[in-house]
Amino acid sequence: MLDFKGETLNYDLPVSLPKADMQSKEAIDIYQLIIHAFTEAGYEYEYNEEEKCFVFTREDDELTYTFSVDVGLVSGDGNIVNWLGVWTTIEDEDFETENEDKIYTTTDDGKLLTYEEIFSNAGSIIQIVENDITEEFYDEKRENL
């Protein structure tokens, strides 16, 4: 459970997350923040056991947005990793495009970002995909017609 901006975040986390992550308060809090950023933007989420990632999906009138966010926040030395990989797919019934990005969790020298910064990083990726990458999607689709 995490108090963040006046809200209590308590999203369900799968018990199959890496053991080191489940034993780290910071890792659990970061997962809560990432899930919160996506659910606030209208995404539903599930955990993909086979791929070991969170999958966030939202459909609008024409497009389906799917974000896959890696897990494994705690490194072998017990510190929080610098970032989590994010793979995005935007598709409609005729066409699909993919994008790769990162949600940063620490500074380059390993200092944990503030929870506001981590939440903002996740939200920024959503905005970039929904605006810039969607525009690229339509441009690429037009070129392929």
Model-assigned labels for residue ranges:
Residues L2-E62, D139-L145:
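Negatively charged, low-complexity tracts enriched in Asp/Glu with abundant Ser/Thr
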Residues E26, I30-I34, E96-L145:
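Ampiphathic alpha-helical segments that act as solvent-exposed interaction surfaces
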Residues N48, T57, S68-D70, D132:
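General "foldedness" signal
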Residues E62-S124:
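Intrinsically disordered, low-complexity regulatory segments enriched in Ser/Thr/Pro
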